[in-house]
Amino acid sequence: MNSALFLAKLPEAYAVFKPIVDILPVIPVFFLLLAFVWQAAIGFR
């Protein structure tokens, strides 16, 4: 019962981090772009 109440309160506690969670799926794309820019900088050796 106590753990169920804790889980119910969790979304409210993490409401502050919602913008960060919205950005998280985009991070792998930035790594892909970083790898491409890095390879372009060294001339695709």
UniProtKB/Swiss-Prot annotation:
InterPro entries: PSII_PsbK, PSII_PsbK_sf. Belongs to the PsbK family. This is Photosystem II reaction center protein K. It is found in: Plastid, Chloroplast thylakoid membrane. PSII is composed of 1 copy each of membrane proteins PsbA, PsbB, PsbC, PsbD, PsbE, PsbF, PsbH, PsbI, PsbJ, PsbK, PsbL, PsbM, PsbT, PsbX, PsbY, PsbZ, Psb30/Ycf12, at least 3 peripheral proteins of the oxygen-evolving complex and a large number of cofactors. It forms dimeric complexes. Pfam families: PsbK. It is a single-pass membrane protein. Disulfide bonds: none annotated. One of the components of the core complex of photosystem II (PSII). PSII is a light-driven water:plastoquinone oxidoreductase that uses light energy to abstract electrons from H(2)O, generating O(2) and a proton gradient subsequently used for ATP formation. It consists of a core antenna complex that captures photons, and an electron transfer chain that converts photonic excitation into a charge separation. The keyword Plastid applies. One of its GO terms (cellular component) is photosystem II reaction center. SUPFAM superfamilies: Photosystem II reaction center protein K, PsbK. One of its GO terms (biological process) is photosynthesis.
